[in-house]
Each structure stands twice: as C-alpha cells, then as structure tokens.
C-alpha cells in the first residue's frame, strides 16, 4: 500500500560524506576515487579498507552498515571498463563477506546456513549506487 499523497517535498536526506565512496570513470576510462586518481587494480583493496575501516579512520566509513559506494561514469566510458570497475567493487564486498564468514563461523560463505549468510550480509550490506552517466567526454 502506498502512503497518502503529499504536496510537501520529501525530507532532505543528509549523507555524511565520510560514508560515501565516490568512484568516477571518465571518457578516457580513468578513475577518480574520492577525488584521487586510482588504478582499477587498486580499487578492490581500497574499497575493502573504506568499507571495513579497520583503523577507525575519520575519513573512512563509520561502519560497514553506513558505507555507500557511488559509481558514476561518462557516456564515453567503454562498457568493458565500467564492468571491470563494477566487478572490482562487487569483489570487495564478496571478499569482506568471505572474511567475515570465516571469522565468525569458521566456514566459507557458501557453506553457511541461510540465516548465517543473512547475518553476514546484514552486517556488511551491499550498497552500490549507480548515477546517471555524464556527457562531459562526448565529442562535439
């Protein structure tokens, strides 16, 4: 059932920028992650550190449940590059889930019960936000 109609604008959601891991892919297939250039092969490792924040740094996510991965590409980005970036981000979550399953239950994720798997994924929810592509790199 839908909520009743309202002419009031929706409440503004405030996101703490420390919890947002922004990944931009430009038309030259280069990455800008949280304002810094990064190579694709470093993305998974750095994403894991951001989500888990083992050192409790103030410039990383408060905790895995608040971490948001935001990916935005340019219309000129090669599809294979976009897929490679997305797969690295997803792989970061997969590794965190595996590590958590082993630490908590002493088993691989695929050996857990449905309830145990849910517990792991609730503690480290997969949140990848995909923004509309930009047109900056299009040729005129």
Question: Where do the language-model regions lie?
Answer:
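Long, low-hydrophobicity, acidic/polar, solvent-exposed interaction domains
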Residues: 1-140
